[in-house]
Amino acid sequence: MPERDPILLTPGPLTTSRMTRDAMLRDWGSWDAAFNRLTKSVCADLVRIAGGGDAYVCVPLQGSGTFAVEATLGTLVPRDARVLVPNNGAYCARIAAILRRLGVAHVELPFAEDEPASAHAIDAALARDARLTHVALVHLETSAGLLNPLDDIAAVCRARGKALIVDAMSSFGALPIALAASGIDALISASGKCLEGVPGMGFAIVRRSALEAAEGRSPSVALDLHDQYAYMQRTSQWRFTPPTHVLAALRAALDQFFDEGGQPARGARYARNCATLVDGMRALGFEPFLDARAQASVIVTFYAPADPAYAFPAFYAAVRDAGYVLYPGKLTTADTFRVGCIGALGADEMRGAVAAIGGALESLGIAMR
């Protein structure tokens, strides 16, 4: 008997629907008109979800979400710019690492791993250093599941006349975002997150005027968003071999996204998943790392058991044997693990995950205190 696919309680890759997986059973010619129409429809819908209107365009890119983050920073940020990076986790630090590699001056504004970035502190940092030209913000820091206040920070950037680039990798599709009148220059996400597609394609939704001003700026050929967009405008094609099956799966996932009711319905389902998970885990004795006011309903970080019998590899394996895949912790200040609430899942799967975790505690002899 074939093994049942595990349920992925991770922030991407994640459990996808049968319809999304079935969409990958067809082969596509990368220069074919039908595939070009598929690309165009996906890009139009991504701008629509972001509330961008005619002022924004979508540029898809082969690879993981980090490819799209690096491409966006390398394309939109001039080499003589100076970027403020609010930092409360590993994905904020990754932005700083990319800027360092690009040779772009940047200033990290540190926050604790359980502390949302403060719009007031960002405003003060911009006031102190007139050389700062951009802010690069992670909307949802997946290290802990921490939500940063995008609207408040965008308002500060508008008032200060600073360009804002947003990594919305783990929030786009689940949380409300409206680009029109936001002042955001670019929003970056990927196929395999809250849109419930499969991994393999990132994308940037960019203010048209900012992209058009970036010709020739990227130090990379493959990661040049301006060149990618200009080529697509001329030919309707990708510059290099596209992830055809990934795009087809994303088209199917977007159809299901709209059928479900779009972002409000998707976000509400994830919120129910999160509440079911947290309530069940608390009943087992686990406590979330974050205060509820800072917690996004996409992934929850829990403190690891204090019992010496606990070791994450064995705990992970026991839960995996029960059919659920957890995610290791990524914090520097506490021993934790993470449980995702996204994907083609509902409250029943969350209850099943809690039962599997409870079973792992019992089988491994781990006491909760």
Curated annotation (Swiss-Prot):
The record's annotation in Gene3D superfamilies points to: Aspartate Aminotransferase, domain 1, Type I PLP-dependent aspartate aminotransferase-like (Major domain)
Residue ranges the record marks as coiled coil = none
Q: What is its EC number?
A: 2.6.1.37
Q: Which residues carry this modification: N6-(pyridoxal phosphate)lysine?
A: 193
Say if the entry is tagged with keyword Cell membrane. Answer: no
What name is this protein filed under?
2-aminoethylphosphonate--pyruvate transaminase
**Keyword annotations:** Aminotransferase, Pyridoxal phosphate, Pyruvate, Transferase
Cofactor(s) needed, names only, are: pyridoxal 5'-phosphate
According to its UniProt entry, this protein's organism is Burkholderia pseudomallei (strain 668)
State the protein's purpose. Involved in phosphonate degradation.
Q: Does the record carry Transferase as a key word?
A: yes
Instruction: Return the InterPro entries for the record.
Output: Aminotrans_V_dom, NH2EtPonate_pyrv_transaminase, PyrdxlP-dep_Trfase, PyrdxlP-dep_Trfase_major, PyrdxlP-dep_Trfase_small, SP_NH2Trfase/AEP_transaminase
Q: How does it assemble?
A: Homodimer.
Q: Which Pfam families match?
A: Aminotran_5
Taxonomy of origin reads: Bacteria, Pseudomonadati, Pseudomonadota, Betaproteobacteria, Burkholderiales
UniProt gene name: phnW
Its recorded reaction(s) are: (2-aminoethyl)phosphonate + pyruvate = phosphonoacetaldehyde + L-alanine
